[in-house]
């Protein structure tokens, strides 16, 4: 696996993006709200900074992890993802709609996981 998609830019989605980016994976994070995406990237940057300050992560690795995260509002961004992790709000109707819109954009061999 090289590319991971994350649906939802809340606490869980940003955490998943953080861990995957530090692990060396390219991350595509999608949310319906640009503001949520901006907050998520700022949170990841803050948390990576804390890891760096504590000596848990080199500064070069922090910058590299941040560079691996891209954001957007269109599910088409997941077209080349090997795995897409759904971390949207805990509402069954929302989740059904997410999957309905997501599936047409995925490769036939892509995996889908839900949080």
What role is predicted for each listed range?
Residues 35-36, 50-112:
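Rossmann-like NAD(P)-binding element
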Residues 7, 15, 30, 72, ...:
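Structural motif
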Residues 1-50, 54:
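NAD(P)+-binding Rossmann beta1-loop-alpha1 motif at the extreme N-terminus of oxidoreductases
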């Amino acid at each position: 696996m090289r590319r991971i998609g994350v649906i939802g830019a809340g606490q869980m989605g940003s955490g998943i993006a953080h861990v995957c980016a530090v692990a060396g994976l390219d991350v595509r994070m999608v949310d319906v709200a640009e503001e949520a995406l901006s907050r998520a990237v700022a949170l990841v940057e803050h948390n990576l900074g804390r890891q760096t300050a504590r000596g848990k992560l080199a500064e070069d690795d922090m910058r590299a992890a941040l560079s691996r995260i891209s954001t957007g509002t269109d599910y088409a961004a997941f077209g080349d993802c090997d795995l897409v992790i759904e971390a949207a709000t805990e509402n069954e109707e929302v989740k059904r709609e997410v999957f309905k819109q997501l599936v047409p954009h995925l490769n036939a061999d892509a995996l889908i996981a839900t949080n």
